[in-house]
Amino acid sequence: TYIDTLFEKEIPKTQEAFARFHTYYQIIEIMISTVFEDKFKKFVEQLNNSVDSLFDQRDELGNMIQEKQRVKWLFSEYVSISQQEKNILDECCRKLLQENGKKINTEMGDNLYSVRCLLVHSMYMLNEYSHKLLDEVNKAFLDVIMDMLLTFKIT
């Protein structure tokens, strides 16, 4: 699978922190696409069994297409990660977000998504200290990814 290829070929040679983060985040992208498929199938089943119109359920459908929401569902419903590893990754993300004047959220998944957005939209503005913080994020992120790969299941 593509994930096997990432671990066998890409991750060992990816040394730059930015590239490493995006390689790890690709695993999240793969998982949230599966989350979307699962949620959408359940949504269609619910529509078939419901007297409510699609118009009445448009908000739920809108939530499904938001990446941030799928990341939340992934961490809350589809994987089991030790609280300690969640806390470590969350703290690393918080430090990086704070250093760059970004909003800090209450949930680890939200903070991880915010780091992703920071890197995609503002990487060119990161200072040297932020790059060191990103290395810390990556170390914690890899531990979380390993747990995710071992525990991912469709609900």
Over which residues does each language-model region extend?
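Amphipathic, oligomerization/interface secondary-structure segments
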Residues: 1-155
